[in-house]
């Protein structure tokens, strides 16, 4: 019994002494850790380019045309148009219609908000990140965010503002 208690005590001491060591906290090999990312102006520009890339995805571009031009008199539906597009042309926006999902626009808005949050922090860290570049990047992020909200409000009127 005395040996079992000694063994358990040794195991407990051994586990408690290694549980707080830094060697157990591994950084992921295939992901970028947030603390290591926002260090220079190229990080800000890459996230901003990601926002542009998300905006020019087929999901966003198609919805821009469908929500704008197809609902106006500039384009008309045809008999061969899918039912979902015919519903939009008749201004029948249903939650079951895949073309009425606006999550891709919020992806762009999220990226723009991320740039607006972290760009000033990067400007404090990186001496090569000029004030004029910071303001230009912030202006681009605001413009992207405004464009997305313009399409969302034009099509759906009341949308969440984040």
Q: Where on the chain are the PLM-derived regions?
A:
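Long, intrinsically disordered, low-complexity segments
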Residues: 20-23, 76-78, 105-108
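Short coil/linker segments at helix-helix boundaries
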Residues: 158-162
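Membrane-proximal, proline-rich intrinsically disordered regions
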Residues: 20-71, 94-95
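Bacterial Sec-dependent N-terminal signal peptides
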Residues: 1-29
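Conserved, well-structured interaction surfaces
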Residues: 45, 49, 53-57, 81-156
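Active-site segment of extracytoplasmic enzymes that catalyze sulfate/phosphate-ester chemistry
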Residues: 72-84
